[in-house]
Amino acid sequence: MHADQNYEILIVMKVDRINCKNDQGDILDFDPYSMYQSLKGYTDIAEAEFMVKFFDLHANNDSILNIWPDVMPIKPLSIDYDKVDIYIQGGFLLLSKEAYDYLYHFLDAYGEFLKIDVNGSEMVLFNLRVFGQEDLDKCIENYAKGLRSSFKSFAFIDSDINSKLLFKSKLLDGIGLFCGEEFKQLVEVKSLNGIEFNEIN
């Protein structure tokens, strides 16, 4: 090897999509419509406009902290809800009280914490408000009967996400949550249960 030869070392950031472990489905009784019904009395926005705003909450990256009550009661759908540390539902990251106490300082700059009460148990919904910039050349759509059903491959631009702990995608309407190794390690070092990490690139 000649001394004057230059080599570029390319390091590709590993990205994981965060999913519910074993695809357990919803564990709490809420959806966009029920939450709209619960919150419409806290805003002066016209009902029809507020409904659209709430259904597009994650895609539009809106905040609802200013209309969220101190604590919102939500009923469980699963008897095992209190055994989950961290979960994904309706585009929110669901945190147990213990997971919230641990992750608060890491996630505070990335979104807002919405406190809920589930049968007397304090839990928190985290509304992520940070997007990652997709690498459109590597996001290949999968079509079924002429309609986009999913993506064959998905990727983000490394320079945009390499300093982001947690982020979402505009192409997925803000519903999918993604992370790099740092967040994954935060979860694993405390053995927080309820989610799994699936590498996308």
For each feature predicted by the language model, list its residue ranges.
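Phosphate/anion-contacting hairpin/loop surfaces
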Residues: 1-201
